[in-house]
Amino acid sequence: TALIDSRSMFIHGITERLASLDGYIAAASGYTLNVIRRSGSYVGTGSYVKVMNGDEQVAFYTVILYGDVNGDGIIDDDDFGIISNYLNGTDTEQLFEGSPFATAADVDRDGAITQADYAIINDYLTNGEPINQA
């Protein structure tokens, strides 16, 4: 199941390559969920979940997949490159503070995007070390 943070309005605790959030979250009786993917075929960072009561939107959440900093629902070399560029100062536009992408890049959740986050993603890509999504 996914974790819903009502303070930050983030949903996290999902895995890569999900076409839907079925089995991760469910709407309470009388409500429906509308999932809007940010890009591609998978639910990833920056995707949205609207909680609807009929035609009325009653809540709005943003999905965070730690390590997925481009929002395609896959943690791969593209994400690794974005963090690398951020750390060497050549591209800071996508990872501005407070954005869901910056949150996803801070995989160790210490409040900053650092070499430690870079190393965790590298370990995931090269050794299959899991990234904590909880």
Question: Which residue ranges define each predicted feature?
Answer:
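Cellulosome-associated attachment modules in secreted, modular CAZymes
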Residues: T1-A134
